């Protein structure tokens, strides 16, 4: 801490101090609000809404609104928000990040700004990392909101459209980051406004904000369809790469690359996690695939497949980056160690790994819609978040999201002791010391949580503990089913738990054990079903007697265990509290801080220490070469720990290097995605205007004008006249649609004697006349089937434009992805790849817009609409049609149950309209 901070306090301390007056106002209202009846307290909600409508601001009513929530929390939840929680709530309302330590009650803090901002009626989104937390929090905190007269919604995977619309229409909506993002993309693929579920992005509170906005930032949300390309090339590329010789280096520079070209086919840069073919490797590829030059544009696809194959074999490691389970390659989250079901590496890397592991290679998918979390969350007018660890990423939150961080003091002083790291020369020496430390803690009953960076290491530590006769639990991506239960009991007397990274994050580790999970286990043993148990521990309103009885039984069982563990908790405190043992420093200091933060909740004692070796990846790849040489000269043996002070600077510098590199990678992803984001905003904004019923007839007329003008100007150029042959070539694709063949024949005969401008005007006049006739024919065909005052042609224009935009936008996404994959090579030509990507991406976007306009016009001229007479004849044919000789009578058929027509289903009359928009008599008799 610098001299300025010592004298004036840290920035966070100054920010917290500045809020003292507001918190004092809230606390001053406590007695007054405590005296209110339930009805009077609930009436505050309507009072606040009225004051906002009268011109007051949210800041004006904040003290009273927070005092209302505090009193409601006491009455409904039995919890009273502490002073520091009120401070956290104000920080969130201000659109900032509140860094609050584990166990400080972040879930309750969120209710304060959520209630205040929901009073505007514009909706508040509370975003969590998984469905379980979203459901649990919405039910538990939902009781408080409902008591105060606000509605609560829940958005999780598997809900139908109607349920989601209700959830988003609520005052406060809980859900996961994935579901909010996917719903946004699905809304922007809708053809009718009735299909939309979201109603805007006004205010979001993001729980575990660092996990969602930093760790997940590089992962794009993608809605995809089945691609058409064969998977054979992935297998061919993998078979080829399997025969190549690989060389691993800490980092690749130009000289190293030259020196290794003769003895390796590809080089793996362990620091950058990249793989590159050498000159020898390129030569082998050209021979194997019988091509002249791998760099030629026509070999781009092959080159891409080979590059992904060398990355799959050289960089991606089984049981670290992914696991193979039931014939599937499943990604392991590098930060939590959890399996990421349903997620796939993009750009063909997943298929390359499938080929490497000899499992079924899935077809490459076609991207229908995509957005990164970075750009999704930047849609919100106001964004805030909570986490226990954010300060180390302060620069990134500020640069990318314009969010600043305020560290909230703990309610009770932190009693955890963070010991200095111990560093060993080799991994073998380190793991021996790890087992000895665990044994020492275990003998005195001190619970230990061992944090590892991979499945591989967690299983190695587990084997060593088994050999040492130490009973323990292992928690990694392979054994995740009982994650919360195992982590919850990690604070019991003598417990030893080995876990990958932040497994079980979000579950409190209580000293002596977690009464809630112990009660669940007992009721399960007594035969209570998981379904009933979920209801028994839930908070949703119900009048079901079985559920009410189950809740009563659960409350009694939990109370019994709370009493039992009180004594055990005292024994654990005497033993020193929870001991956090890190087996390796993570690339990010934030992840290390998260691991430490599992101990010392709410003033409990605790201890933490990291055990390192010079062979750990972070020191091997990013540590100074000088340190390694120094250790050799000192002659330190494997079992003797090194002086940590000498290495502390090197370790921190190594972590800062990696953090800086990862930040630059995420920033680079954003620079590229910002190009797509600008284009996406244009497309989605125009789509929304069309969905909202904007009359686009004038836009269609402009498209028609532009399409016809481009026919002539695009082929005439500087010529005084257009030849007959050129005219024929220019207009062939619009023959039989915009123009009749006879019209084009007549104009073609006069083309070489008509100035281009005049020819363009005459063509446009003909096209406009044809369109007017087309409109008249369609209106006649649809007569009686449209709602009064609605035009069939206007509806057709709207639907066709949306469908064409979607088709071309999907193809454009793929084209931009391909452009980005190859744009990096521009750096060799002294060009900035991002600048080139922006320039070429803009050109491609303009070409797409022109193509959309022409295709929309063409389809409006060619789409077929059945006439009322055709529909009538078809119905008669269906009734009277017989095969073979009969007496001509219609045989009576058994009555069959026909599926009910949904309001949004196409009307069976053949009009092409939704049932609710169609007015035909045949299918609307009971309407």
Segments from the language model and where they lie:
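Short cysteine-rich clusters marking metal-coordination/redox-active sites
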Residues: 907
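Conserved P-loop NTPase motor core
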Residues: 1-613, 617-630, 635, 685, ...
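Conserved tryptophan-centered aromatic signature that marks the ligand-binding surface of SH3
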Residues: 912-917
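Residue-level signal for mature regions of secreted extracellular proteins and peptides
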Residues: 900-902, 911
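Extended, charged helical/alpha-beta scaffold domains that provide interaction surfaces
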Residues: 33, 322-330, 336-343, 573, ...
């Amino acid at each position: 801490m610098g001299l300025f901070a010592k004298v004036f306090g840290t920035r966070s301390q100054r920010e917290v101090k500045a809020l003292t007056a507001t918190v004092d106002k809230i606390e001053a209202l406590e007695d007054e609000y405590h005296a209110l009846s339930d009805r009077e307290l609930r009436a505050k909600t309507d009072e606040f809404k009225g004051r906002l409508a009268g011109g007051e601001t949210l800041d004006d009513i904040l003290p009273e609104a927070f005092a209302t929530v505090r009193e409601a929390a006491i009455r409904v939840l039995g919890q009273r928000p502490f002073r520091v929680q009120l401070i956290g709530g104000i920080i969130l309302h201000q659109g900032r990040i509140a860094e609050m330590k584990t166990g400080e009650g972040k879930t309750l803090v969120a209710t304060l700004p959520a209630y205040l901002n929901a009073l505007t009626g514009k909706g508040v989104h509370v975003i969590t990392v998984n469905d379980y937390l979203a459901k649990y929090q919405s039910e538990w905190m939902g009781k408080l909101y409902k008591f105060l007269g606000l509605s609560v919604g829940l958005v999780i995977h598997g809900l139908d459209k109607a349920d989601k619309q209700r959830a988003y229409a609520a005052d406060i909506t809980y859900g996961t980051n994935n579901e909010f993002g996917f719903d946004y993309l699905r809304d922007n693929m809708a053809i009718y406004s009735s299909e939309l579920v979201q109603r805007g992005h006004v205010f979001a509170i993001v729980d575990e904000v660092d996990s969602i906005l930093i760790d997940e930032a590089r992962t794009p949300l993608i809605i995809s369809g089945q691609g058409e390309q064969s998977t054979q090339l992935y297998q061919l590329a993998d078979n080829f790469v399997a025969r190549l010789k690989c060389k691993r280096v800490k980092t690749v520079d130009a000289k190293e690359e030259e020196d290794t070209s003769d003895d390796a086919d590809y080089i793996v840069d362990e620091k950058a996690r990249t793989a590159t073919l050498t000159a020898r490797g390129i030569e082998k590829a050209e021979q194997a695939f019988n091509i002249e030059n791998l760099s030629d544009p026509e070999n781009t696809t092959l080159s891409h497949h080979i590059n992904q194959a060398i990355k799959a074999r050289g960089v991606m490691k089984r049981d670290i980056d992914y696991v193979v389970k039931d014939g599937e390659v499943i990604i392991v989250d590098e930060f939590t160690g959890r399996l990421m079901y349903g997620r796939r590496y993009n750009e063909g890397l997943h298929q390359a790994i499938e080929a490497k592991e000899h499992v079924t290679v899935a077809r490459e998918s076609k991207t229908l819609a995509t957005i990164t979390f970075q750009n999704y969350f930047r849609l919100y007018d106001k964004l805030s978040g909570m986490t226990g660890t954010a300060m180390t990423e302060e620069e990134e939150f500020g640069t990318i999201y314009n969010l600043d961080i305020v560290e909230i003091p703990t309610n009770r002083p932190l009693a955890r002791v963070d010991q200095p790291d111990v560093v060993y020369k080799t991994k073998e020496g380190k793991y021996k010391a790890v087992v000895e430390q665990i044994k020492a803690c275990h003998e005195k009953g001190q619970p230990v949580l061992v944090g590892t960076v991979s499945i591989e290491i967690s299983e190695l530590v587990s084997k060593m503990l088994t050999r040492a006769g130490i009973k323990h639990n292992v928690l990694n991506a392979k054994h995740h089913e009982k994650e919360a239960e195992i982590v919850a009991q990690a604070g019991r007397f003598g417990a030893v738990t080995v876990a990958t990274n932040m497994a079980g994050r979000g579950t409190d580790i209580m000293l002596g054990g977690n009464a809630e999970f112990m009660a669940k286990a007992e009721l399960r043993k007594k035969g209570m079903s998981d379904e009933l148990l979920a209801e028994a521990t839930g908070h949703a309103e119900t009048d079901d007697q079985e559920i009410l009885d189950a809740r009563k039984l659960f409350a009694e069982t939990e109370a019994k265990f709370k009493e039992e563990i009180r004594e055990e908790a005292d024994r654990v405190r005497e033993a020193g509290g929870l001991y956090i043992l890190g087996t390796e420093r993570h690339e990010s200091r934030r992840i290390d801080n998260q691991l430490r933060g599992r101990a010392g909740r709410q003033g409990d004692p605790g201890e933490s220490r990291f055990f390192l070796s010079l062979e750990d990846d972070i020191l091997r790849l990013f540590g100074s070469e000088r340190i390694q040489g120094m250790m050799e000269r000192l002659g330190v043996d494997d079992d003797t720990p090194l002086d940590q002070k000498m290495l502390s600077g090197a370790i921190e510098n190594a972590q800062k290097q990696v953090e800086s590199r990862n930040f630059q990678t995420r920033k680079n992803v954003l620079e590229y995605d910002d190009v797509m984001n600008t284009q996406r905003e244009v497309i989605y904004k125009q789509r929304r205007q069309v969905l909202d019923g904007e009359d686009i007839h004038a836009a269609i007329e402009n498209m028609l004008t532009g399409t016809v003008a481009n026919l002539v100007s695009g082929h005439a150029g500087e010529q005084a006249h257009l030849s007959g042959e050129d005219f024929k070539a220019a207009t062939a694709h619009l023959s039989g649609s915009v123009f009749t063949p006879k019209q084009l024949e007549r104009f073609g005969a006069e083309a070489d004697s008509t100035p281009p401008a005049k020819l363009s005007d005459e063509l446009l006049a003909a096209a406009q006349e044809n369109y007017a006739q087309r409109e008249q024919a369609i209106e006649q065909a649809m007569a009686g089937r449209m709602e009064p005052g609605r035009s069939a042609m206007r509806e057709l224009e709207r639907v066709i434009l949306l469908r064409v935009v979607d088709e071309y936008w999907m193809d454009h996404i793929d084209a931009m992805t391909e452009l980005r994959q190859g744009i990096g090579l521009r750096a060799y030509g002294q060009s900035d790849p991002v600048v080139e990507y922006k320039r070429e991406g803009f050109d491609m976007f303009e070409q797409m817009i022109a193509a959309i306009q022409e295709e929309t016009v063409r389809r409006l001229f060619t789409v077929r609409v059945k006439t009322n007479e055709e529909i009538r004849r078809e119905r008669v044919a269906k009734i009277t049609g017989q095969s073979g000789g009969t007496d001509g009578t219609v045989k009576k058929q058994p009555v069959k149950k026909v599926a009910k027509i949904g309001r949004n289903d196409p009307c069976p009359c053949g009009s092409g309209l939704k049932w609710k928009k169609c007015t035909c008599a045949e299918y609307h008799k009971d309407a």
